[in-house]
Amino acid sequence: MSVYVRRLRSEDLPSVLRISKWLHENSRYQVFTYNEEKVEHLLSLSLNPDSPVFVVVALQKGSDEIMGYFHGYVDFHYFSDMKYAGDWAVCVLPLHRKYAPKILRLMVQAFEKWADKNGAKEVSIGASTEAYGTGYKKFLQRMGYRDVGFLAVKGR
């Protein structure tokens, strides 16, 4: 199967919003309300090419079906006036998981290229959904990322 990624277009928003809702419902984030208007706003920011927000979608050549998306940003580091890039959401739908290594590689490479262009000194990608296996971490390590810590949560 031939897969490619491209920047988000306004006509992609309904599909990406459905994927984001699925991700919300199938992750630890389901304890939080889902604010579709907020998510749509954050996704839409990437439609401006000068925005510090980035979204790519993955598609199969010859199809309009979105297989997954990567939503990231560039911001100034807490300690510095230098920029870093991070991710807000990364999702490949279960139906397309057999293509996940290729889809993720293309999405991460596109994000890294965009982050470089936007002056990021570092790229940080993580997983906190509790909806992933060990494969994603291993994939990121093969892409040159290192494990730098952990995230602990406590519900209320």
Question: What kind of feature is each model-predicted range?
Answer:
Residues 2-18:
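A short beta-loop-alpha structural element at the N-terminal edge
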Residues 57, 65-75:
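Conserved beta-strand in the GNAT
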Residues 24-43:
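Conserved GNAT-fold acetyl-CoA-binding loop/helix
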Residues 76-87, 146-147:
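A conserved beta-turn-beta hairpin within the catalytic core of GNAT-like acetyltransferases
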Residues 44-57:
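A short helix-loop-beta-strand connector motif used in the catalytic cores of GNAT acetyltransferases and
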Residues 106-121:
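Conserved acyl-CoA
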Residues 107, 123-135:
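Conserved beta-strand-loop-alpha-helix junction that forms the acyl-donor binding cleft
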Residues 88-100:
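A short, internal acetyl-CoA/4′-phosphopantetheine-binding micro-motif in the GNAT/acyltransferase core
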